[in-house]
């Protein structure tokens, strides 16, 4: 996949990642770009015209540097602490924001259903600001089957659930977050241990999934912050 921009590339390198090739816009210079090139002398670099660079980049603002990398593989590690199950989340901005917050609060694992947006797409990577590199993410998962394998409670975020703020969350727990339009699927709701909701004032039916995810994750962090490593 492609990492667009020196900040994202720098974050990837700091996480221990290896760059395969670099693509540089001949018309753009910066200290940050030059430092990345200088620190990676063995990486092949393609210097191309601006008109070609903008065709490769998906971003509206040109960054000047793109890196080609292999998508990191995640070996399965038995989940513990807080895990997220993401059900059919399509918006790359929401998905990237959720992953960024998950890394910030020390989430152990993120499992994504087959219908979720590609977490390694340029827009999702941009939204996460490279948080992918510090998390264990599993794509293309059958969440219904996965729930049956978990040895701890699985909570689903749902409007008809019990208040999140009245809940003593388990130390080891998975929380399901549903798609922007439909929420958590009926099959996953039926398989969940408990349904929880975020209290809201009258007239507001739901929150953006990214905002809801942040509230849930930070409530877990609040309850267990002395035990969470960030």
Residue ranges and their predicted role:
Residues 14, 68, 76-162:
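RNA substrate-binding interface of SAM-dependent RNA methyltransferases
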Residues 27-28, 50-52, 115-117, 180-182, ...:
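Short, acidic/turn-prone active-site loops that include or flank metal/cofactor-
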Residues 103-105, 116-119, 124-133, 186-230:
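Structured adenosyl-cofactor binding patch, chiefly the S-adenosyl-L-methionine
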């Amino acid at each position: 996949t492609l990492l667009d921009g020196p900040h994202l590339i720098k974050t990837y390198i700091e996480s221990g990642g290896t760059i395969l090739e670099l693509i540089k816009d001949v018309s753009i210079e910066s200290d940050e770009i030059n430092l990345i090139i200088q620190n990676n002398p063995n990486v092949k670099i393609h210097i191309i015209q601006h008109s070609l660079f903008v065709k490769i980049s998906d971003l509206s603002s040109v960054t000047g540097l793109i890196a080609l990398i292999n998508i990191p593989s995640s070996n399965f590690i038995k989940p513990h602490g807080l895990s997220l199950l993401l059900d059919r989340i399509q918006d790359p901005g929401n998905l990237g924001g959720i992953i960024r917050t998950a890394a910030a609060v020390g989430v152990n694992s993120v499992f994504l259903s087959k219908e979720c947006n590609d977490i390694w797409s340029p827009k999702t990577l941009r939204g996460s600001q490279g948080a992918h590199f510090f998390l264990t993410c599993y794509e293309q998962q059958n969440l219904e089957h996965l729930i049956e394998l978990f040895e701890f409670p699985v909570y689903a975020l749902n409007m008809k659930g019990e208040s999140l703020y009245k809940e003593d969350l388990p130390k080891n727990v998975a929380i399901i977050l549903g798609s922007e339009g439909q929420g958590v699927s009926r099959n996953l709701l039926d398989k969940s241990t408990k349904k929880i909701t975020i209290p809201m004032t009258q007239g507001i039916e739901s929150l953006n999934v990214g905002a809801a995810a942040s509230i849930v994750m930070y409530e877990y962090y609040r309850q267990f912050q002395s035990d969470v490593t960030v």
